[in-house]
Regions:
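Conserved ABC transporter NBD signature motif
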Residues: 62-70
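Pre-Walker A (P-loop) beta-loop-beta motif of ABC nucleotide-binding domains
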Residues: 26-37, 91
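Helix-to-loop junction immediately C-terminal to a conserved catalytic motif
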Residues: 54
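The feature captures the beta-strand-to-loop junction immediately N-terminal to the Walker
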Residues: 39-41
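Conserved structural motif at the start of ABC-family nucleotide-binding domains
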Residues: 8, 23-25
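ABC ATPase nucleotide-binding domains
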Residues: 35, 74-86, 90-233
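ABC ATPase nucleotide-binding domain
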Residues: 9, 29, 65, 343-345
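Non-catalytic connector elements of ABC transporters
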Residues: 241, 251-381
C-alpha cells in the first residue's frame, strides 16, 4: 500500500493574545488529498489554527511546514494555500467569470489558459452557464460556489475553509456538504475545514480534529470519534450521549461490572482498576428498554415522555436519583405507557468507559500510532 504523504505539519504551534493563550502547544499532521475538519465550540482555537496555517495570524511559537518547507514567516500569497470565508468576499462590480479569474489575470496567465481553467471550474461547481451574472444576482449557495471556484483557480496545494456553510439554510447546507465532499475527492487536493457543526464534520471528513480550550482533544475518523470518544468532552460534544458516573466493582476478561447510584451495569473496558471512578458513555440508539431484567443489569427507571421525531422515537427515562436517560428507537415500536417502570440495558461493547481525569489532552505526533486508515491514533498524554 502506498504510504501517505504528509502535506501540512504543525509543530509546537501556540498563540497568545493580550487576554491569554488561545492555542496551546499543537502538533498536527495532515495528509495529501485528505479532508480534515477542525471541530469545536466557539473559542476553542479552531479558527486561530486555520488563520495561522493561512498566514493571516502569526504563531507565538512553533512551526508551520507545507510540503516540508517552513512557511512560518511567509505571507499568505507565498504559501500555496487559499482560503474560503463565510462571507464569500466576492467583488460586487465583477461578474462571476471575472471574480474567478481575478488572481489569474494578476499573475498575467494567458487568456487562453484563463478561459480554459475558469470554464472548467465553473462547470465543476455547477455554474457553467452563469459566468456573466453579477454577485447580486446570485443566491447564497451560488455565491459560495463562486468563492470556492475562485479559491481553486490558483490550484493551491491546500484549500482552507472557514465555516463557509454557516450562513446557508439547512437544506442548502446539507446539499453543499455533499457537493464539497464530491468536489474535494474529484480534485484530490487537501481541504482543511473549520466548523462548530458536528453534522458537517461527520458527513464530510476523512478525519476530525476535535478542539477544546486550545487543546486537541481527539483526532480520528468520524466513526472513531463518534463510537470511541476518548474524553467526556468529545462524548458530550459529538452527537447525543448518556454519560454516567460509576465505580468499577469487578473486572473479568475485559468485561467490567460497574456500580451506578441507581444500580449495576456492564461494559467492556481495559486498563481500569477496581473501585476506580469512571464515566460511562452510551449513545441513545444503543440503549435498550425492556420489561424483563437483563443479566448483569439492575438499572431501572420510569418512562417520563415519548417524542415522535420522524425517523426515531425519543424516549425519556427518569432514574430514581433524578438522572435522565435518552433512548432512540424505531417509531413503529409499540409506545410505552408514561410512568411505567422499565429496565435499561445495552450490549457491553456499545458502552465506552473513560477515566475521569480532568483536562485529558492528546498529542497526535509525539504519541502517534498509525491506525488502520493510515491516520494517526492518539494516546493519552
Amino acid at each position: 500500500m502506498k504510504e501517505k504523504k504528509v502535506i501540512l505539519k504543525l509543530r509546537g504551534v501556540t498563540k497568545e493574545f493580550e487576554e491569554g493563550q488561545v492555542l496551546k502547544s499543537t502538533d498536527l499532521d495532515i495528509y495529501e488529498g485528505e479532508f480534515v475538519t477542525l471541530l469545536g465550540p466557539s473559542g476553542c482555537g479552531k479558527t486561530t489554527t486555520l488563520r495561522i496555517i493561512a498566514g493571516f495570524e502569526e504563531a507565538t511559537t512553533g512551526q508551520v511546514l507545507i510540503e516540508e518547507r517552513d512557511v512560518t514567516s511567509l505571507p499568505p500569497y507565498k504559501r500555496n494555500v487559499n482560503t474560503v470565508f463565510q462571507n464569500y468576499a466576492l467583488f460586487p462590480h465583477m461578474n462571476i467569470f471575472k471574480n474567478v479569474s481575478y488572481s489569474l489575470v494578476e499573475k498575467k496567465i494567458s487568456k487562453k489558459e484563463i478561459k480554459e481553467r475558469v470554464t472548467k471550474l465553473l462547470e465543476m461547481v455547477q455554474l457553467g452557464k452563469m459566468e456573466g451574472r453579477m454577485p447580486n444576482q446570485l443566491s447564497g449557495g451560488q455565491k459560495q460556489r463562486v468563492a470556492i471556484a475562485r479559491a481553486l483557480a490558483n490550484e493551491p496545494k491546500i484549500l482552507l475553509l472557514d465555516e463557509p456553510l454557516a450562513a446557508l439554510d439547512l437544506k442548502l447546507r446539507q446539499t453543499m456538504q455533499l457537493e464539497l465532499k464530491t468536489l474535494q475527492k474529484s480534485l484530490g487536493i487537501t481541504f482543511v475545514f473549520v466548523t462548530h457543526d458536528q453534522e458537517e464534520a461527520l458527513t464530510m471528513s476523512d478525519r476530525i480534529v476535535v478542539m477544546n480550550k486550545g487543546n486537541l482533544e481527539q483526532i480520528g475518523t468520524p466513526k472513531e470519534i463518534y463510537e470511541q470518544p476518548k474524553t467526556k468532552f468529545v462524548a458530550d460534544f459529538i452527537g447525543e450521549s448518556n454519560i454516567f458516573e460509576a465505580s468499577v466493582v469487578a473486572n473479568e476478561e475485559e468485561t467490567l461490572t460497574l456500580m451506578m447510584e441507581n444500580g449495576h451495569v456492564k461494559a467492556n473496558g481495559t486498563g481500569f482498576k477496581n473501585e476506580e471512578i469512571v464515566y460511562i458513555c452510551v449513545r441513545p440508539e444503543n440503549v435498550r428498554i425492556t420489561k424483563e431484567i437483563v443479566e448483569g443489569f439492575t438499572l431501572k427507571g420510569f418512562v417520563a415522555d415519548q417524542i415522535y421525531a420522524g425517523s426515531v422515537m425519543r424516549t425519556i427515562i427518569h432514574l430514581p436519583n433524578g438522572d435522565v436517560v435518552k433512548v432512540n428507537t424505531h417509531p413503529m415500536e409499540t409506545p410505552l405507557e408514561i410512568g411505567s417502570l422499565v429496565n435499561i440495558s445495552w450490549d457491553v461493547d456499545k458502552a465506552v468507559i473513560m477515566h475521569t481525569t480532568e483536562d485529558t489532552v492528546y498529542d497526535a505526533i509525539e504519541f502517534g500510532l498509525l491506525n488502520s486508515q493510515g491516520g494517526l491514533e492518539v494516546n493519552e498524554k
